[in-house]
Amino acid sequence: MTRSLKKNPFVANHLLNKIDKLNT
C-alpha cells in the first residue's frame, strides 16, 4: 500500500483530505 501511495501522491492526498473531513 505504501508503494502505491508513493507512486500516486494525488491519490494519497485525496485520502488525506477525506480523513480530514471525517475528523472535522
UniProtKB/Swiss-Prot annotation:
Sorted UniProt keywords: Chloroplast, Plastid, Ribonucleoprotein, Ribosomal protein, RNA-binding, rRNA-binding
Cellular localization per UniProt: Plastid, Chloroplast
GO CC terms, sorted: chloroplast; ribonucleoprotein complex; ribosome
Family: Belongs to the universal ribosomal protein uS19 family.
Main location: plastid
Its job: Protein S19 forms a complex with S13 that binds strongly to the 16S ribosomal RNA.
Species this protein is from: Petunia hybrida
Record protein name field: Small ribosomal subunit protein uS19c
GO molecular function, one term: rRNA binding
KW Membrane (keyword) present: no
